[in-house]
UniProtKB/Swiss-Prot annotation:
The chain crosses the membrane at residues 17-37. This is Small hydrophobic protein. Residues 1-16 are intravirion. The gene is SH. Residues 38-44 are virion surface. Keywords: Host cell membrane, Host membrane, Membrane, Signal-anchor, Transmembrane, Transmembrane helix, Virion. It is found in: Virion membrane; Host cell membrane. It is a single-pass type II membrane protein. Inhibits TNF-alpha signaling and seems to block apoptosis in host infected cells.
Length: 44
């Protein structure tokens, strides 16, 4: 059963999931940006 798109609760849950995904991608981007050069420096 798909939730009713007009249901404000399902809309809120969808937006919250989107925010979590955006936050995860942002943290992942920062992790890659800072950790990868550090590891490369340590391993070289």
């Amino acid at each position: 059963m798909l939730p009713d798109p007009e249901d404000p609760e399902s809309k809120k849950a969808t937006r919250r999931a989107g925010n979590l995904i955006i936050c995860f991608l942002f943290i992942f981007f920062l992790f890659v940006t800072f950790i990868v050069p550090t590891l490369r420096h340590l391993l070289s």
